[in-house]
């Protein structure tokens, strides 16, 4: 069950993990930010799991690499 989900919280996780000071582009993916590498993506997903009390399986961990894909996946877990 998805706990306390909001899109703004999800964006905050991305901004915190990627150390983005300004506006975050919701159409972004792993190739759009220099510091959004596989380790950062892993940390983003771990932070999302912790914040919203959900779990990603191993297939999701390797496939989710854009904000929109992650947003859709998180919403499906509700």
Please state what every model-predicted region is.
Residues 2-36, 40-46, 51-78:
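Phosphopantetheine-dependent thiolation modules in NRPS/PKS and related acyl-activating systems
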